[in-house]
């Protein structure tokens, strides 16, 4: 049987690359000037991802209490609070305009302007969806420290609460893998079928993020056309 994390890394590589090269995430590959609107778009997209994945993890934990140890590693309350503060700070300082950033950035605010919001990701099972969600969540935190340093080096007062909070999540990466490898035999999930399910669900989370990025850019384009 293939190791779960080897399979996840190898079999989600294509979608991971697509996501990194999808605007607005692609701005991190460039050493250009700070793009306020793209940065705000990233924060909004990640807010939607973190809300959806935290809900999936919470539901799975309710059904399988043994997941509690890994579920706590995403630190969802701290992450969402940091996102909300950054989104509000960006708009409050007039770096860019957004009519919804006067309070907590919620799913309802997204629905107000995103009529084609992507549907929730495919799920093979609550456990595989939760573990794959945490895999994508913590995996996305690995470069957070680098992003914070790059943003702080720019001659702008850029809010970085989100990436600072994610840098904290990155510290749980090794513990997460160890805990999952200990947990799977206990749940009788140490088999090829579960590995396949987890890979499928992880790819679904990546595709969800890509869809959120596409929807955000479509929404911004539509608003620009309406204004012009």
Where are these regions (language model features)?
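Metal- and O2-centered redox machinery and metal/ROS homeostasis
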Residues: 1-228
